[in-house]
């Protein structure tokens, strides 16, 4: 039987499958056609995410049904160099003691009119 897989980009892929095929088999066929690794694929049918150990017939997927393909979000830890850059960008600032405006490190006066461009500045406190 033929089913369709619709991606988030709007592209529709036609697949030739059997009702006894597992979700892993379907993901492998998508990898053959599109080159997307199965571990990054999430298949949705009737608002439910399809689990790997089950078959198409378990979900009552019939001929010409449409599955939706969503890519798994990648997560993880930031590289130490990026963390250092973010800390430098966010922490190395001066703060006006009157209006709490964030200012560059080299500032001598506040840029805001509300505090009268005062020169009462301090370094921003570091987070613990």
Curated annotation (Swiss-Prot):
Q: Which domain of life is it from?
A: Eukaryota
UniProt key word Ribosomal protein? yes
Q: Known Pfam families for this protein?
A: Ribosomal_L40e (PF01020), ubiquitin (PF00240)
Key words, A-Z: Cytoplasm, Isopeptide bond, Nucleus, Ribonucleoprotein, Ribosomal protein, Ubl conjugation
Keyword Nucleus (UniProt): yes
The biological process GO terms on file are:
modification-dependent protein catabolic process; protein ubiquitination; translation
Q: What Gene3D superfamilies does its record include?
A: 4.10.1060.50, Phosphatidylinositol 3-kinase Catalytic Subunit, Chain A, domain 1 (3.10.20.90)
Cellular component GO terms held in the UniProt record: cytoplasm; nucleus; ribonucleoprotein complex; ribosome
Which sites are covalently linked via Glycyl lysine isopeptide (Gly-Lys) (interchain with K-? in acceptor proteins)?
76
Q: Which residues form the Ubiquitin-like domain?
A: 1-76
InterPro entries, per database record? Ribosomal_eL40_dom, Ribosomal_eL40_sf, Ribosomal_zn-bd, Ubiquitin-like_dom, Ubiquitin-like_domsf, Ubiquitin_CS, Ubiquitin_dom, Ubiquitin_ubiquitin-like
Q: Show the GO MF annotations.
A: protein tag activity; structural constituent of ribosome; ubiquitin protein ligase binding
From the record heading this protein, give the residue positions of the covalent cross-link Glycyl lysine isopeptide (Lys-Gly) (interchain with G-Cter in ubiquitin).
48
Q: Can you tell me which family this protein belongs to?
A: In the N-terminal section; belongs to the ubiquitin family. In the C-terminal section; belongs to the eukaryotic ribosomal protein eL40 family.
- What name is this protein filed under? Ubiquitin-ribosomal protein eL40 fusion protein
Q: Which organism is it from?
A: Leishmania major
As recorded in Swiss-Prot or TrEMBL, the protein's gene is named UB-EP52
